[in-house]
């Protein structure tokens, strides 16, 4: 870290792009050199009412399953209006997602985070089948593409609000787009403030609002 700190403060360095842990990002911001930093983050994706739902789900699942979810910019959670939840779940299941029941959600939630609240490295880049076996989930069908867990809160005690570098998604709902926007902001400020947000919509007014 000392060598990295010296490099960031060097007079020939004009700009720093810091990615990785929060300590690295803090060091970049305090170096005195202009810096753009991104630490861990739970990037949410909003499936707005006007979206092409099959296409939006395909894009999210393709993104989240690429390299078994190791890309930090891939979706970490999805969110939709409450009255769309059934349709979203049905389409996700049609395309290979497996929604955990309450007991499975609790079991996997205890596995994906360590006691200190950090991500369990055993999930990183692992397949759904491997994660299911490691976590003791014996009802996940062979060939499931992602594991999806319903989540309501953000922060400690809500493991699916954390970054998950594996084929695991949190699933949130909001009363309407205003409620969704508030939850999205809460998610984004929990880890890696302002990390990544995406929205699937065909309504330009929704784009402007967010």
Where are these regions (language model features)?
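A structured beta-alpha segment of the ubiquitous adenosine-cofactor-binding alpha/beta core
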Residues: 1-13
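Short acidic loop-to-helix transition motifs that present clustered carboxylates
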Residues: 1-3, 23-24, 203-204
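Conserved C-terminal structural/oligomerization subdomain of aldehyde/semialdehyde dehydrogenase
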Residues: 138-210
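Glycine-rich phosphate-binding loop
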Residues: 16-28
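ALDH superfamily catalytic-core signature
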Residues: 25-155
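Short glycine-enriched loop/turn motifs at secondary-structure junctions
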Residues: 10, 38-40, 70-74, 162-167, ...
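Short hydrophobic/charged patches on amphipathic alpha-helices used for structural packing
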Residues: 4-5, 57, 181
């Amino acid at each position: 870290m000392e060598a990295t700190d010296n490099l960031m403060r060097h007079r020939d360095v004009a700009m720093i792009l810091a990615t990785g842990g929060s300590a690295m990002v803090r060091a970049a911001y305090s170096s005195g050199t202009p810096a753009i930093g991104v630490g861990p983050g739970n990037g949410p994706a909003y499936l707005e009412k006007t979206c092409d739902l099959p296409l939006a789900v395909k894009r999210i699942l393709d993104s989240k399953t690429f390299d078994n979810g190791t890309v930090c910019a891939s979706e970490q959670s999805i969110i939709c209006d409450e009255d769309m939840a059934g349709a979203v779940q049905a389409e996700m299941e049609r395309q290979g997602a497996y929604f955990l029941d309450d007991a499975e959600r609790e079991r996997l939630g205890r596995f994906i985070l360590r006691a200190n609240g950090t991500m369990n490295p055993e999930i990183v880049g692992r397949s759904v089948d491997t994660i299911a076996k490691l976590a003791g989930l014996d009802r996940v069908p062979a060939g499931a593409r992602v594991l999806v867990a319903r989540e309501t809160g953000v922060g400690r005690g809500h493991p699916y609000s954390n970054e998950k570098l594996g084929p695991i998604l949190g699933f949130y709902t909001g009363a309407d787009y205003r409620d969704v926007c508030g939850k999205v902001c809460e998610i984004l400020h929990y880890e890696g403030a302002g990390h990544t947000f995406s929205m699937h919509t065909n309504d330009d007014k929704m784009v402007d609002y967010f």
